[in-house]
Regions:
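Active-site-adjacent pocket scaffolds in enzyme catalytic domains
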Residues: 1-62, 113-118
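C-terminal domain-boundary segment and adjacent tail
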Residues: 45, 49-119
Length: 119
């Protein structure tokens, strides 16, 4: 969904009665922050790493997900892409990270958290 409120998936009830999994989006940890905040690569990298570090620490007790909103015309600029490259290297240096899609997160949640789903 386009909800911006969590770093864990959860169910949203719909009018049809069939639940929908919310895998929240973030507008804060987003390459547009480079534009809004006037960040250079180092500032963007710091933002990505600080978000990751906090969520990684919290994930020791319960899973978390992190997404970064990326737009080719923003992050793809030569003076910005380094932040993404360096962040990916940084995150890959940590154990137990699942590189996946939002769709796969939703599917996993539905398959593994049946007790949360009202029938």
């Amino acid at each position: 969904t386009d909800l911006l409120n969590d770093d864990q998936p959860y169910l949203v009830q719909t009018r049809s009665g069939k639940p929908m999994v919310s895998v929240s989006y973030t507008s804060e940890v987003n390459d547009f922050s480079f534009l809004r905040q006037g960040l250079v690569a180092e500032g963007g990298l710091q933002m990505f790493q600080e978000q990751f570090d906090w969520l990684y620490e919290e994930s020791a007790s319960s899973g978390r997900f992190m997404n970064i909103g990326l737009h080719p015309h923003v992050i793809g600029q030569p003076y910005r892409i380094r932040a993404l490259r360096d962040f990916i290297r940084y995150a890959k240096s940590h154990d137990d990270i699942w590189w996946t899609t939002r769709e796969e997160i939703a599917e996993w949640y539905l398959e593994n958290h049946e007790s949360h789903i009202p029938i």
